[in-house]
């Protein structure tokens, strides 16, 4: 008997209010880290109707022009006209940044050159063989749709689109393998002049059928395009946005657990971010090496402590090796202290704006060092000993 089920993941465009906040926070981080690699940054952003507030904590000698940074991000996203509900020129930008507590910093920067974890917490990484980038198919497809919404808007293929938008894909699985797409949901902000009929037809033709892999498409896919019938008011005018509210979109679309810590606006001494990248690096290399077909990796840390307090590997019955053997391999092959992660993944670079929309994982950009599979041979060698 076939084990059959549907699994769903969603993504959002760069013009979604929560993603706007993520991008502003990461732009602030990039500006500072490019000029001060020793900086400690925890930047939170709120966007709402007509204004943006930047808050959080910093420890740096760098002056960051918050207004300029925020306005440039909003402009690049495409909020260039008050008719869109937000305009980079007229929106107020408020700066509420404070200084990092010395009580936190004393546990992070150590005299011996090591780095203690910036907080306690647990982080997860995941990889599987459903796509070439070793990501789950539903989130991979949802990101493709969300990215295409923005690209077709920016290149004027679909000039009636506006920046805010969401996508959702339900995939049909049989015996734990994806076989087809069952349902696609796309909600996109649009100009008031376009008819819903034309919008739906254009989105399906220009985005769905030109972007998604043909092997998963068929005539019976259920489409819901702007199912409420209208989406003119969007962006921060329609909903407030906050940094860190799209943590499942940012990761694996619900295919594995999440420790709860957001990424954007945090420098790599914060293990919420850097250890989640390391956990993906571990999981992806385990799958790429062939020792398993699927891997969930959990790392956990204590504030001010150098070594992780626990490492857990679950291969979902796809490996001939036990969790104990796999964990020994991970400890031998990967550097999982905060300093080891930062150095091995070269994280003290202004790369974070690239991560802040369309997923932190599964995009094999040169800057995304955690997506490299350069540890696969070491893993194979470990199990040949």
Curated annotation (Swiss-Prot):
K(+) binds at residue 44. One of its GO terms (cellular component) is cytoplasm. Residues 100-110 are annotated as: Flexible loop. ATP binds at residues 16, 164-166, 230-231, 239, 245-246, 262, 266. One of its GO terms (molecular function) is magnesium ion binding. Pathway: Amino-acid biosynthesis; S-adenosyl-L-methionine biosynthesis; S-adenosyl-L-methionine from L-methionine: step 1/1. Keywords: ATP-binding, Cytoplasm, Magnesium, Metal-binding, Nucleotide-binding, One-carbon metabolism, Potassium, Transferase. L-methionine binds at residues 57, 100, 239, 270. The keyword Kinase does not apply. GO terms for biological process: one-carbon metabolic process; S-adenosylmethionine biosynthetic process. SUPFAM superfamilies: S-adenosylmethionine synthetase. Mg(2+) binds at residue 18. The keyword Phosphoprotein does not apply. Its cofactor is Mg(2+); K(+). It is an enzyme of class 2 (transferase). Its main location: cytoplasm. Catalyzes the formation of S-adenosylmethionine (AdoMet) from methionine and ATP. The overall synthetic reaction is composed of two sequential steps, AdoMet formation and the subsequent tripolyphosphate hydrolysis which occurs prior to release of AdoMet from the enzyme. Homotetramer; dimer of dimers. This is S-adenosylmethionine synthase. The gene is metK.
